[in-house]
């Protein structure tokens, strides 16, 4: 894990990324939308996400691959991961898009558990995906590497589920991180702003 540091251009990982991008680019026409391009739609729930319920769901659906302490599972080479760590010193940073509850919930619904969920047939409900994302991203119980404080110099460009202030509205940092999101989206639209998530 490089934790936000650029990969060396000639590294095995960078060459793998480039090979994959070249390969996948061969399946789509340029400047044309394609199935799976956008995140799976997810219905916002009318309550704050529950980290407590997310912990129970994490134990049911996620522990076997990502570990009880979010440590992930290393490959045999002890350098890379089969299943990535979700928090701790090797986890993703606060500035990562996966550290945003809405973004992670969309991804979880479409992809997890990896051996049973598909984009067409999700396993998790919308509420379950939101609660697991809230638990995994709960900074009160999970540490992250290299905390950042000024990721977005312009608050209007910040995603509404990014929990670090300042924000372009009067909602609390907790509301931005854990919802409910419908009132925030409504407020932004009423002000003529485009909410990002």
Protein language model regions, located:
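Extracytoplasmic electron-transfer domains, predominantly the class I c-type cytochrome c fold
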Residues: 1-6, 17, 81-143
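N-terminal export/targeting leaders of redox proteins
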Residues: 2-18, 22-26, 143-197
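A short secondary-structure junction motif
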Residues: 1, 24, 28, 68-72, ...
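Amphipathic alpha-helical surface "interface" segments used
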Residues: 8-18, 36-52, 125-134, 153-164
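Short acidic alpha-helical/loop segments enriched in Asp/Glu that coordinate divalent cations
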Residues: 32-36, 67-84, 118-122, 147-150
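Electrostatic cytochrome c docking/interface patches
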Residues: 25-59, 64, 73
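The canonical Cys-X-X-Cys-His
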Residues: 17, 54-73, 86, 132-136
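A short glycine-/small-residue-rich loop at the edge of a beta-strand within enzyme catalytic domains
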Residues: 45, 49, 56, 77, ...
């Amino acid at each position: 894990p490089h934790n936000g540091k650029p990969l060396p251009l000639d590294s095995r990982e960078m060459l793998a990324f480039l090979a994959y991008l070249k390969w996948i680019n061969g399946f789509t026409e340029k400047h044309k939308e394609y199935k799976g391009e956008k995140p799976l739609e997810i219905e916002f729930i009318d309550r704050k996400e529950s980290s407590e319920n997310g912990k129970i769901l994490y134990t049911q659906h996620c522990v076997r691959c990502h570990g009880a302490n979010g440590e992930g599972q290393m490959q045999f080479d002890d350098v890379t991961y089969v299943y990535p760590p979700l928090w701790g010193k090797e986890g993703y940073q606060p500035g990562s898009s996966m550290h945003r509850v809405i973004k992670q919930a969309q991804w979880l619904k479409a992809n997890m558990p990896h051996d049973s969920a598909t984009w067409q047939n999700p396993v998790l409900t919308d509420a379950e995906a939101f609660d697991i994302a809230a638990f995994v991203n709960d900074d009160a119980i999970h540490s992250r590497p290299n905390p950042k404080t000024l990721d977005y110099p312009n608050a209007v460009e910040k995603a509404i589920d990014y929990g670090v202030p300042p924000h372009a509205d009067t909602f609390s940092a907790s509301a931005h991180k854990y919802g409910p999101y419908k009132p925030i989206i409504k407020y932004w639209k009423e002000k003529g702003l485009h909410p990002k998530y």
